[in-house]
């Protein structure tokens, strides 16, 4: 398997729970490495741009409102099969359907406030990483 990178966002609900450390520890325990990270407060424009793929969906405005409601922690994760591994750690989008021990099962409040975001494909990962980080801000290790 190839080493991949994926974008991960710890959303405002999980940040408010002081869950950042535990979430990052779970990534690292699974073999993923954090190679870039920062805390940001997204503007409405940034959130609309980042989630533009969902612009026509009925939940778009609520998503933008939620993602701008507090700070988020964004990080680039690197490792073997990182995209799939991160999505397994996150669990199902709906926390009621997420397996025990997944991030969404343990930290999400609802399908809307679902604790974490992760890229769903190599192409998406590349675009999402470039949205938040310049190449020289990513430090492979």
Curated annotation (Swiss-Prot):
<feature type="binding site">
    <location>
        <position position="104"/>
    </location>
    <ligand>
        <name>ATP</name>
    </ligand>
</feature>
<keyword id="KW-0546">Nucleotide metabolism</keyword>
<dbReference type="Pfam" id="PF00334">
    <property type="entry name" value="NDK"/>
</dbReference>
<feature type="binding site">
    <location>
        <position position="59"/>
    </location>
    <ligand>
        <name>ATP</name>
    </ligand>
</feature>
<dbReference type="InterPro" id="IPR034907">
    <property type="entry name" value="NDK-like_dom"/>
</dbReference>
<keyword id="KW-0479">Metal-binding</keyword>
<dbReference type="GO" id="GO:0005737">
    <property type="term" value="C:cytoplasm"/>
</dbReference>
<feature type="binding site">
    <location>
        <position position="93"/>
    </location>
    <ligand>
        <name>ATP</name>
    </ligand>
</feature>
<keyword id="KW-0067">ATP-binding</keyword>
<dbReference type="GO" id="GO:0004550">
    <property type="term" value="F:nucleoside diphosphate kinase activity"/>
</dbReference>
<dbReference type="InterPro" id="IPR023005">
    <property type="entry name" value="Nucleoside_diP_kinase_AS"/>
</dbReference>
<dbReference type="GO" id="GO:0006228">
    <property type="term" value="P:UTP biosynthetic process"/>
</dbReference>
<comment type="similarity">
    <text>Belongs to the NDK family.</text>
</comment>
<comment type="function">
    <text>Major role in the synthesis of nucleoside triphosphates other than ATP. The ATP gamma phosphate is transferred to the NDP beta phosphate via a ping-pong mechanism, using a phosphorylated active-site intermediate.</text>
</comment>
<dbReference type="InterPro" id="IPR036850">
    <property type="entry name" value="NDK-like_dom_sf"/>
</dbReference>
<feature type="binding site">
    <location>
        <position position="114"/>
    </location>
    <ligand>
        <name>ATP</name>
    </ligand>
</feature>
<dbReference type="GO" id="GO:0006183">
    <property type="term" value="P:GTP biosynthetic process"/>
</dbReference>
<dbReference type="GO" id="GO:0006241">
    <property type="term" value="P:CTP biosynthetic process"/>
</dbReference>
<feature type="binding site">
    <location>
        <position position="11"/>
    </location>
    <ligand>
        <name>ATP</name>
    </ligand>
</feature>
<dbReference type="GO" id="GO:0005524">
    <property type="term" value="F:ATP binding"/>
</dbReference>
<keyword id="KW-0808">Transferase</keyword>
<keyword id="KW-0460">Magnesium</keyword>
<comment type="subunit">
    <text>Homotetramer.</text>
</comment>
<feature type="active site" description="Pros-phosphohistidine intermediate">
    <location>
        <position position="117"/>
    </location>
</feature>
<dbReference type="GO" id="GO:0046872">
    <property type="term" value="F:metal ion binding"/>
</dbReference>
<feature type="binding site">
    <location>
        <position position="87"/>
    </location>
    <ligand>
        <name>ATP</name>
    </ligand>
</feature>
<keyword id="KW-0963">Cytoplasm</keyword>
<keyword id="KW-0547">Nucleotide-binding</keyword>
<dbReference type="InterPro" id="IPR001564">
    <property type="entry name" value="Nucleoside_diP_kinase"/>
</dbReference>
<protein>
    <recommendedName>
        <fullName>Nucleoside diphosphate kinase</fullName>
        <ecNumber>2.7.4.6</ecNumber>
    </recommendedName>
</protein>
<keyword id="KW-0418">Kinase</keyword>
<keyword id="KW-0597">Phosphoprotein</keyword>
